[in-house]
Curated annotation (Swiss-Prot):
Name this protein carries in UniProt: Uncharacterized protein CPT2R1.02
Domain of life of the native organism: Eukaryota
Lineage summary: Eukaryota, Fungi, Dikarya, Ascomycota, Taphrinomycotina
Length: 119
């Protein structure tokens, strides 16, 4: 079978901490297509990864868990991180995922993740 020179670009997908997340499943499907030789390159653009502050697993670990399951993926760029706090007086620490005053809920840590895999 001859590999098709197809490049797949996914612009601004959302990866969440849900095991049933559509984007997570899409990445796995694309990985299978890559292994089958049906696509030659996968590019994620402006990927937003989110999770609730109530979750014990912080966002960078989550992103690694999702993407490291796909052997073809090579991280080209690291994370550009922004923190958002909603309906809470405390601040959210981007580096540690810790809430400054211990309040829970309302805060979402978002990472702008860019990846370019394949050849």
């Amino acid at each position: 079978m001859t590999a098709l020179m197809n490049h797949i670009y996914i612009d601004n997908p959302l990866i969440s901490n849900s095991t049933n997340n559509v984007t997570h499943e899409l990445l796995i499907d694309l990985h299978e297509l890559y292994n089958d030789g049906e696509i030659s390159r996968i590019v994620l653009l402006r990927t937003l990864v989110t999770q609730s502050a109530d979750d014990a697993t912080w966002i960078i670990n989550l992103t690694d868990d999702v993407l490291n399951g796909l052997p073809l993926l090579k991280k080209r760029d690291r994370y550009t991180t922004q923190c958002h706090s909603t309906n809470m007086a405390s601040t959210y620490d981007c580096d540690t995922g810790a809430n400054a005053v211990g309040a829970r809920g309302g805060a979402t840590l978002a990472a702008d993740y860019r990846g370019d895999w394949g050849g």
